[in-house]
């Protein structure tokens, strides 16, 4: 599945979820809503749940980073696990760069976890949200998401066997483009049964050379900053003199 199709299907699924939510109120307000009404609710829902960070870089640091070939990198936390996938990496960052995301996910399985290698998705991708689950059948196919599991988590019901569960999430990059890319791959295989994945609204930001989006890693990132947006929707951080400060 191409990234553009993935984004389109995620938006379509969210639209359906909003429709289903409104159907539950039909007994109270039986008048059918128009497509434009659903679109308005969809837009407001996304706006209410969007998180964003603005990264400011001092002039001297920007010049040095660019001359040395450093990329601006982001990673997303899942559960209590260490960050282990480069969510996005950018070369064309400027003095002010904004990165944002919404809670639109895709579940997948991978056959391996290997540091310094890009994620290789082995199963099909399934659009899924918090409070939903997907069954990986004995043939290795993920079924459509259904309600199930903890409200703040995504649940994999594994009937297949040894697999590394993974999650992708939709983001809007510093270039304004929307794309869904991996945020997490379990470093250890899981066996049959249920595995609960809990995305956390905390991200890691750092600069690194010779790295690509979707690269897995198993060591801490130097000169990084962790930004917790659990109780906030936006934050700004300044990189100046080789260190980070809150703005």
Question: What do the PLM-derived regions correspond to, one by one?
Answer:
Residues 2-247:
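Intrinsically disordered, low-complexity segments enriched in small/polar residues
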């Amino acid at each position: 599945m191409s990234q553009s199709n993935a984004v389109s299907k995620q938006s379509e699924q969210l639209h359906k979820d909003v429709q289903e939510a409104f159907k539950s109120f039909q007994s109270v307000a039986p008048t059918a809503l128009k497509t434009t009404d659903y679109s308005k609710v969809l837009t407001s829902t996304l706006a209410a749940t969007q998180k964003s960070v603005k990264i400011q870089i001092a002039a001297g640091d920007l010049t040095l980073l660019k001359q040395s070939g450093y990329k601006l990198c982001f990673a997303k936390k899942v559960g209590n696990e260490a960050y282990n996938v480069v969510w996005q990496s950018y070369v064309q960052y400027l003095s002010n760069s904004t990165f944002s995301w919404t809670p639109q996910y895709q579940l997948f399985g991978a056959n391996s976890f290997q540091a310094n290698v890009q994620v290789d998705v082995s199963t099909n991708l399934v659009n899924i949200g918090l409070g939903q689950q997907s069954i990986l059948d004995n043939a290795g196919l993920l079924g459509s998401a259904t309600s199930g599991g903890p409200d703040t988590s995504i649940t994999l019901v594994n009937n297949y066997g040894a697999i590394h569960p993974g999650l992708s999430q939709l983001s809007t990059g510093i270039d304004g483009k929307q794309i869904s890319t991996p945020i997490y791959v379990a470093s250890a295989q899981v066996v049959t049964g249920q595995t609960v994945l809990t995305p956390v609204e905390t991200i890691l930001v750092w600069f690194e050379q010779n790295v690509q989006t979707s690269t897995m890693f198993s060591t801490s990132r130097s000169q990084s900053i962790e930004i917790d947006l659990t109780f906030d929707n936006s934050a700004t951080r300044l990189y100046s003199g080789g260190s980070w400060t809150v703005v």
